[in-house]
């Protein structure tokens, strides 16, 4: 069976991920006119720039959908977002600022939940608005086929017939008007935006040029913290975790995880927390640039990692970062539910997140400027009395440290001998300008002493 259909399968049911925007509206109407039977599926992902979700399926029916459904994906999306925080599943960072993989998380949930809904309706052909140059075409392909092994893919934007007739936004708008729908194109922004409850992605158009900065972006989840005219008073906030799960903000327990994320977004958004400018590597290895918002994810991540570093030992923290980065890349590639990702995720949640219990108090200021004011946890292995510089009972003595340092002589001697060997073979050039000017002049016998 051919998985990808290059031309419209007339007479067959086609599920389309319907956003209500011009592209998917024109595509749905065009498919109906060409003889297909379109079914519209809209994901409620808690998009901060969407005012009326209930109106979207109604518009789909007006444009010719056989049926239109609104699928509430918010609970599952927040669940996956919290899991990503627990695992540190983020691999794109610049100057200490993190991209929280909010779009890949959204695609994992959308791709599985919408295709599952289509399968319930006997719809086994799926179309969406992703283009052939981006990441989403592969993410949706993977998640769709994972959910329904019988799935076929039809994308109007890969169909030459559709492109020849309605290849641009102007043509789509004229098509809608000619068909009796007073559809006016929205005012073109200098960039495109994709969002969900976890975060927003701004990219393309003017943002493709690196001399266009964050200053051209109008945040939809926060404030323009770079604008000095925007007043942003400092705010103290506390975040509490129990076994790796955020349970309270400012001492208030929220009714569910969705409300928790919404409140975290409101708090972080008041300061512009979690905005970052990233150059990343797409799945096809071409670089792209995006400006991201994720105020709630950032707030929870900061508090979570503060507790984690005070609770776990160095080797565990090292594995958390290494495995989290690996997991983040798998998530970015559309492999969040692959076996290798599940293996990493399970170990990080089981052995790392389960011990992260406590409360962190922060002062938020402008943008990503904040201070940690207090960290409290019964699980802390940070114990100041162990290393105090004041007199008193100590867990180890000066003689203990002398013995420990003496044992280091073994590997120091081995290292010195290897450096000598490197210098003798010419691999290590020593001179007065290097940090090891004396190595090359050492006698072999002295090195071995």
From Swiss-Prot:
GO terms for cellular component: cytoplasm. Pathway: Amino-acid biosynthesis; L-arginine biosynthesis; L-arginine from L-ornithine and carbamoyl phosphate: step 2/3. L-aspartate binds at residues 131, 135-136. It comes from the Bacteria. It is found in: Cytoplasm. SUPFAM superfamilies: Adenine nucleotide alpha hydrolases-like, Argininosuccinate synthetase, C-terminal domain. CDD domains: ASS. ATP binds at residues 17-25, 43, 129, 131, 136, 194. The keyword Transferase does not apply. InterPro entries: Arg_succ_synth_type2_subfam (IPR023437), Arginosuc_syn_C (IPR048268), Arginosuc_syn_N (IPR048267), Arginosuc_synth (IPR001518), Arginosuc_synth_CS (IPR018223), Arginosuc_synth_type_1_subfam (IPR023434), AS_cat/multimer_dom_body (IPR024074), AS_multimer_C_tail (IPR024073). Keywords: Amino-acid biosynthesis, Arginine biosynthesis, ATP-binding, Cytoplasm, Ligase, Nucleotide-binding. L-citrulline binds at residues 99, 135, 139, 192, 201, 203, 280. Its main location: cytoplasm. GO terms for molecular function: argininosuccinate synthase activity; ATP binding; protein homodimerization activity. It is an enzyme of class 6 (ligase). It catalyses: L-citrulline + L-aspartate + ATP = 2-(N(omega)-L-arginino)succinate + AMP + diphosphate + H(+). Its EC number is 6.3.4.5. One of its GO terms (biological process) is urea cycle. Belongs to the argininosuccinate synthase family. Type 2 subfamily. Homotetramer. This is Argininosuccinate synthase. It comes from Salmonella arizonae (strain ATCC BAA-731 / CDC346-86 / RSK2980). The gene is argG.
């Amino acid at each position: 069976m051919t998985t990808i259909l290059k031309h419209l399968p007339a007479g067959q049911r086609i599920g389309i991920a319907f956003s209500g925007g011009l592209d998917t509206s024109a595509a749905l109407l065009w498919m109906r006119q060409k003889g297909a039977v379109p079914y519209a599926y809209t994901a409620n992902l808690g998009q901060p720039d969407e005012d009326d979700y209930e109106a979207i399926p109604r518009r789909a029916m007006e444009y010719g959908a056989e049926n239109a459904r609104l699928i509430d994906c918010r609970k599952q999306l927040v669940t996956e977002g919290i899991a990503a925080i627990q695992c540190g599943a983020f691999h794109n960072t610049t100057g200490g600022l993190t991209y929280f993989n909010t779009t890949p998380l959204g695609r994992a949930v959308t791709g599985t939940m919408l295709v599952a809904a289509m399968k319930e309706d006997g719809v086994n052909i799926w179309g969406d608005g992703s283009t052939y140059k981006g990441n989403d075409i592969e993410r949706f392909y993977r998640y769709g086929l994972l959910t329904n092994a019988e799935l076929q893919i039809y994308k109007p934007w890969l169909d030459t017939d559709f492109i020849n007739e309605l290849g641009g936004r102007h043509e789509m708008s004229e098509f809608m008007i000619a068909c009796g729908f007073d559809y006016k194109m929205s005012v073109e922004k200098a960039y495109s935006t994709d969002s969900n409850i976890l975060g927003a992605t701004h990219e393309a158009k003017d943002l493709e040029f690196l001399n266009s900065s964050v200053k051209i972006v109008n945040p939809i989840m926060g404030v323009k913290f770079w604008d000095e005219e925007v007043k942003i008073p400092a705010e103290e906030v506390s975040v509490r975790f129990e076994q790796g799960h955020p349970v309270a903000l400012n001492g208030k327990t929220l009714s569910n995880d969705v409300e928790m994320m919404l409140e975290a977004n409101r708090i972080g958004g008041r300061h512009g927390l979690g905005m970052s400018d990233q150059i990343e590597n797409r799945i096809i290895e071409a670089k792209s640039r995006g400006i991201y918002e994720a105020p709630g994810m950032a707030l929870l991540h900061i508090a979570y990692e503060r507790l984690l570093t005070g609770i776990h030992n160095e080797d565990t923290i090292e594995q958390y970062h290494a495995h989290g980065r690996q997991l983040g890349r798998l998530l970015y590639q559309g492999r969040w539910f692959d076996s290798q990702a599940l293996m990493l995720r399970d170990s990080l949640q089981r052995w790392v997140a389960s011990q992260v219990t406590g409360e962190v108090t922060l002062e938020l200021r402008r943008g990503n400027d904040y201070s940690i004011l207090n960290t409290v946890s019964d699980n802390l292995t940070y114990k100041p009395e162990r290393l105090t510089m004041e007199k008193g009972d100590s867990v180890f003595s000066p003689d203990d440290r002398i013995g420990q340092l003496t044992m280091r002589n073994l590997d120091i001697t081995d290292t010195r001998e290897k450096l000598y060997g490197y210098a003798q073979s010419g691999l290590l050039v020593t001179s007065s300008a290097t940090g090891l000017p004396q190595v090359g002049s050492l006698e072999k016998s002295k090195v071995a002493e």
